[in-house]
């Protein structure tokens, strides 16, 4: 049955049309159809696009990637040029304040524990919460790690020091003031030396000495945790935890050197057992003071740490990583330069930094001495430090990292700085002790060998301790344990390698077996596993070399005619593949190849 709208059309001109869009669909007719009325442009017409013509502005992917890479390189080059121009015109000055938690069992002015693993608000004394009538009791034991830190930083210990109150109101400080040593700290006039291997900026040369203005003891504040929109939780376990505040002189002029300074000071504090943790676990925080002035301009009105002619400084608080120190200084330097170049004035203020940001943000106006209302603490007597105590602590200080690196890089060990530095820093010196034991044992085992060969044993041992054994530890993702591969075992393995009883690949295989738990002595393990090297005769080497040469005559001609000696390594590899595993020695294979290829030109 025809639909009503179709019945109204004559048969000859009937067409199927969509009732929604009313577009006719012509059917076959026996007589000519009348012309259809023009279609309204208001109705969409669908058509199939079959052309493959590309848009004229379309760029092939590979070309686009190249253009993007060039643009990035150009931006970096422009940034470097701008920074270079900025360095020539403007001088950056940075001073650092480092707050480090001391390694003590009790708090600074109470007997409450400093444990960081207990439940929140479980280690709190009445004085920590500023209960009325509670009095501070200075804990003598907290002074010892503070003194070790100051001595390691080459400071002068003051025979008499005093405590002061620094007044401010904030929720993490129940008393309304912090006890510190502003006027008479216990240590002054120290320094820290930074070297190129510490990561200082190239423009700072090979070494930089940064002065330490003072080191003072003070209280830590409560730990706060924010729950938006309006809730904050406070853990008072941290209140009155002993801190040392280390204040450097404003003698740093590059962001990289500032980060290197914080890193070096943390390393020094850890090496003398003055602190429990570093920046990575929140045990050390840094504030940086940043100022800008035109290079060569000494007419500035601001003075910090006895150095005058500086620009107005801003302070960036609570930086918790070395990268944050460097990035925050760069951002603040650029901000101050932009302000000055636009004719503005840099305001003295406290600013904050968020990891991953490119700009610092204002927190509050900068407080001065008057704002904090420093005053002597009437409840604490002066602190007297005896010269005998200082002398005893100085005698028992561990060797500094700089001295250890100098020793390892010197004639006794001959290590490159790149190996000496991690040996000193890894596992708080445990890796260094292990390495020195391996070297001593190896030298004893090799005492019957050529003195010239013995001279390089320390470097060989360094490579095995850092690279080969270190690689196994990194792959296992486990904490260092010297008993896993005892020093005598590693020394015996290297001895077998030096005597050419085994090849390098075999030595690595055996080390992996020992690391996995094989406790057999090295000689027994090599014998039972049939891993001892059975040297090939000259005739066997020649046979292997001739077989390898026959594989690629064209490369042989390149070596002979163009002296491309680097391609000999390919033939050495072929000989090692064709020969019995572990028996082909690369140096001997190379020598035979040179005879057959070069001497027969």
From Swiss-Prot:
SUPFAM superfamilies, per database record: GatB/YqeY motif, Glutamine synthetase/guanido kinase
GO MF assignments: ATP binding; glutaminyl-tRNA synthase (glutamine-hydrolyzing) activity
Organism of derivation: Aspergillus niger (strain ATCC MYA-4892 / CBS 513.88 / FGSC A1513)
Protein name: Glutamyl-tRNA(Gln) amidotransferase subunit B, mitochondrial
Function: Allows the formation of correctly charged Gln-tRNA(Gln) through the transamidation of misacylated Glu-tRNA(Gln) in the mitochondria. The reaction takes place in the presence of glutamine and ATP through an activated gamma-phospho-Glu-tRNA(Gln).
Catalytic activity: L-glutamyl-tRNA(Gln) + L-glutamine + ATP + H2O = L-glutaminyl-tRNA(Gln) + L-glutamate + ADP + phosphate + H(+)
Family: Belongs to the GatB/GatE family. GatB subfamily.
Pfam families xrefs: GatB_N (PF02934), GatB_Yqey (PF02637)
Keywords: ATP-binding, Ligase, Mitochondrion, Nucleotide-binding, Protein biosynthesis, Transit peptide
GO BP field: glutaminyl-tRNAGln biosynthesis via transamidation; mitochondrial translation
Species lineage: Eukaryota, Fungi, Dikarya, Ascomycota, Pezizomycotina
Gene Ontology cellular component list: glutamyl-tRNA(Gln) amidotransferase complex; mitochondrion
Complex and partners: Subunit of the heterotrimeric GatCAB amidotransferase (AdT) complex, composed of A, B and C subunits.
Localisation per UniProt entry: Mitochondrion
PANTHER family: GLUTAMYL-TRNA GLN AMIDOTRANSFERASE SUBUNIT B MITOCHONDRIAL AND PROKARYOTIC PET112-RELATED, GLUTAMYL-TRNA(GLN) AMIDOTRANSFERASE SUBUNIT B, MITOCHONDRIAL
Transit peptide stretch: 1-55
Record EC number: 6.3.5.-
Highest taxon of the lineage: Eukaryota
């Amino acid at each position: 049955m025809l639909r009503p709208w179709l019945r109204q059309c004559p048969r000859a001109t009937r067409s199927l049309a969509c009732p929604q869009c009313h577009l006719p669909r012509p059917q076959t007719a026996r007589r000519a159809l009348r012309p259809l009325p023009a279609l309204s442009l208001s109705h969409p017409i669908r058509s199939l696009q079959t052309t493959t013509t590309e848009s004229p502005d379309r760029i092939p992917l590979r070309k686009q990637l190249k253009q993007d890479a060039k643009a990035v390189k150009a931006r970096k080059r422009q940034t470097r040029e701008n920074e270079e121009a900025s360095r020539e015109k403007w001088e950056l000055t940075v001073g650092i304040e480092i707050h480090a938690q001391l390694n003590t069992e009790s708090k600074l002015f109470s007997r409450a524990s400093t444990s960081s693993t207990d439940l929140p608000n479980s280690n709190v004394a009445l004085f920590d919460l500023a209960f009325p009538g509670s009095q501070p009791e200075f804990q003598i034991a907290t002074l010892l790690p503070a003194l070790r830190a100051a001595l390691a930083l080459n400071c002068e210990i003051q025979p008499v020091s005093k405590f002061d109150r620094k007044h401010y109101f904030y929720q993490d400080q129940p008393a309304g003031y912090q006890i510190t040593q502003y006027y008479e700290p216990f240590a002054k006039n120290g320094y820290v030396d930074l070297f190129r291997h510490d990561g200082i900026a190239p423009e700072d040369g090979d070494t930089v000495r940064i002065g330490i203005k003072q080191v003072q003891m003070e209280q830590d504040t409560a730990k706060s945790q924010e729950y938006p929109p309006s809730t904050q939780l406070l853990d008072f376990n941290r209140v009155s935890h002993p801190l040392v505040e280390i204040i450097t002189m404003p003698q740093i002029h590059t962001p990289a050197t500032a980060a290197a300074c914080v890193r070096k000071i943390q390393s020094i504090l850890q090496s003398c057992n003055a602190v429990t943790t570093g920046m990575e676990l929140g045990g050390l925080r840094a504030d940086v003071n940043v100022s800008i002035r035109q290079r060569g301009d000494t007419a500035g009105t601001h003075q910090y740490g006895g150095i005058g002619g500086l620009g107005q400084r801003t302070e960036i608080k609570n930086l918790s990583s070395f990268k944050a120190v460097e990035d925050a200084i760069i951002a603040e330097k650029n901000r101050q330069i932009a302000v000055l170049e636009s004719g503005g004035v840099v305001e003295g203020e406290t600013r904050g930094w968020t990891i991953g940001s490119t700009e610092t943000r204002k927190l509050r106006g900068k407080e001065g001495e008057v704002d904090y209302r420093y005053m002597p603490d009437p409840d604490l007597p002066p602190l007297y430090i005896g010269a005998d105590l200082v002398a005893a602590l100085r005698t028992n200080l561990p060797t500094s990292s700089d001295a250890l690196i100098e020793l390892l890089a010197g004639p006794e060990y001959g290590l490159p700085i790149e190996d000496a530095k991690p040996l000193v820093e890894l596992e708080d010196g445990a890796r260094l002790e292990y390495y020195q034991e391996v070297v001593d044992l190896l030298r004893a085992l090799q005492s019957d060998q050529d003195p010239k060969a013995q001279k390089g044993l320390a470097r060989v041992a360094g490579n095995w301790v850092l690279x080969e054994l270190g690689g196994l530890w990194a792959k296992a993702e486990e904490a260092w344990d010297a008993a896993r591969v005892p020093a005598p075992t590693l020394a015996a393995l290297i001895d077998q390698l030096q005597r050419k009883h085994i090849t390098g690949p075999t030595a690595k295989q055996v080390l992996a077996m020992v690391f996995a738990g094989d406790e057999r002595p090295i000689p027994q393990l090599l014998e039972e596993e049939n891993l001892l090297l059975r040297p090939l005769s000259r005739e066997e080497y020649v046979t292997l070399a001739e077989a390898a040469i026959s594989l690629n005559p064209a490369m042989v001609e390149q070596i002979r005619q163009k002296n491309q000696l680097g391609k000999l390594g390919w033939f050495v590899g072929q000989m090692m593949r064709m020969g019995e595993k572990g028996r082909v020695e690369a140096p001997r294979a190379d020598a035979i190849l040179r005879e057959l290829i070069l001497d027969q030109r």
